[in-house]
A protein has these predicted regions:
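Residues in well-ordered alpha-helical elements
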Residues: 101, 113, 125, 132, ...
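Proline-centered turn/helix-capping motifs that create local helix->coil transitions or kinks
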Residues: 158, 165-171, 207, 223, ...
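N-terminal Rossmann-like NAD(P)+-binding domain of SDR-like oxidoreductases, especially those catalyzing
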Residues: 6-218, 336, 346, 353-364, ...
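C-terminal substrate-binding subdomain of Rossmann-fold SDR/epimerase-dehydratase oxidoreductases
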Residues: 14, 18-20, 24, 33, ...
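A short, amphipathic alpha-helix embedded in the catalytic core of nucleotide-handling enzymes
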Residues: 57, 202, 231-236, 263-267
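Hydrophobic alpha-helix immediately C-terminal to the catalytic Tyr-X-X-X-Lys motif of short-chain
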Residues: 194, 198, 202, 232, ...
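The catalytic Tyr-centered alpha-helix of NAD(P)H-dependent dehydrogenases
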Residues: 184-191, 215, 221, 225-229, ...
């Protein structure tokens, strides 16, 4: 059975054969941290956030080799990486993190010392109808990667999680800090909480140098338009209304992707092993407020734009808001610099220019009020490994 095959392929050498020496530890809590990578593997690097991280690292640090591993799912695109495709310090490998043989091969042959793990299924709506695929990719995929990384003695492993693991926040509650209890409320968030729990266990059990990040809602160029901001922009360009879940009062903190790429740059070089870092901002807006701002941006001649707002049934469960404290990351020298208005303007401009074929499978299904993965998208446990890397 496929599941049995997946479990067999995920097995790696016994712990006794691991190259990682737990006696050699990087700075711990309260210590100065300064880290210089050599060869970086970015998983999910053709996706939204990770593609911006790849571009930043490739361009800013020509002395680093950046290897991007991505299976090119429906929401990823090699076009996201066009601007670095010909850089000598960049390499792309098509492959799936569920294949331990492939991961071990890449880590060995590319002499990887640093991993930024962003590969994941991330769309909450999809997790309500196909949660098993989220467990496969987000939990098992992370576990496969951690075991392979441990076996080669990885020097830094950054695990990308989400603020959704904290669960819903309410107006009278303080902001969530990194040590707070995790209370995920949807299958996507639950798999991300499980994945980061496994990642952190490798720090506690083996002193493997793991860092976890939890970010706010990110927006900007390259994002597949199943997510709220690009979906609304694409619909408005087509003269279709923004589809508001419920009454539109649910709020989110929206942070521009360029600021998030800068945060990962900071964490890569200055983060402390074993720590968790929230990546957040102060730009909180309800979904209805976002829709109205986008109506004005796309159709400035229709100031009210009520005909471009449509209310649809809410998700099975929709968190009221997420509110996180990023003080720990600020102490490393990072703060967001792009305002919501500036970020929205850049985002609208990009989506107006780019056609739907930026993504191989198109975007029609993504523009539905409650999108599901496009027909024909495979959720098989282990996909084919390319014969040539």
């Amino acid at each position: 059975p496929a599941c049995a095959v997946a479990i067999r392929t995920a097995m790696v050498a016994p712990a006794a054969a691991d190259k990682y020496n737990p006696a050699v530890r990087r700075p711990t809590k309260g210590q100065e941290a300064s880290y210089t990578p050599t060869n970086i593997l970015v998983t999910g690097g053709a996706g939204f956030i990770a593609s911006h991280v790849v571009i930043r690292l490739v361009k800013s640090y020509p002395q680093y080799k950046v290897v991007c591993l991505d299976k090119i799912d429906y929401c990823s695109s090699l076009h996201n990486l066009d601007e670095v495709a010909n850089y000598p310090n960049y390499k792309f490998i098509k492959g799936n993190i569920l294949s331990a043989d492939l991961i071990k091969y890449v880590l060995d042959t590319e002499k990887i010392d640093t991993i930024l793990h962003a590969a994941a299924q991330t769309h909450v709506d999809n997790s309500f109808g196909n949660s098993f695929a989220f467990t496969e990719n987000n939990v098992l995929g992370t576990h496969v990667l951690l075991e392979s990384a441990k076996s080669i003695g990885i020097r830094r492993f950054i695990h990308v999680s989400t603020d959704e693991v904290y669960g819903s926040s309410y107006q009278d509650e303080p902001s969530r800090r990194e040590g707070d209890v995790l209370e995920p409320t949807n299958p996507y968030a639950a798999t991300k909480a499980a994945a980061e729990a496994i990642a952190r266990s490798y720090w506690f059990s083996f002193k493997m140098p793991v860092i976890v990040t939890r970010g706010n809602n990110v927006y900007g160029p390259h994002q597949y338009p199943e997510k709220v901001i690009p979906k609304f922009v694409r619909r408005l360009v087509k003269e279709q209304p923004c589809c508001i879940h419920g009454d539109g009062s649910n709020s989110r903190h929206f942070i521009y992707v360029g600021d998030v790429a800068a945060a990962f740059d900071t964490i890569l070089h200055s983060g402390v092993d074993g720590e968790v870092y929230n990546i957040g901002c102060d730009d909180e807006h309800t979904n209805l407020e976002v829709a109205r701002k986008l109506v004005r941006a796309v159709h400035p001649d229709r100031a009210e734009g009520d005909d471009l707002i449509e209310y649809v049934p809410d998700r099975p469960f929709n968190d009221v808001r997420y509110y996180i404290d990023s003080t720990k990351l600020h102490a490393l020298g990072w703060k967001p610099v792009v305002s919501f208005e500036e970020g929205l303007a850049k985002t609208v401009e990009w989506y107006k220019k780019v056609s739907a074929d930026w993504w191989d499978i198109g975007t029609d299904s993504a523009l539905a009020a409650h999108p599901t993965p496009p027909a024909g998208v495979s959720n098989s446990l282990v996909q084919d490994v390319p014969s040539k890397l």
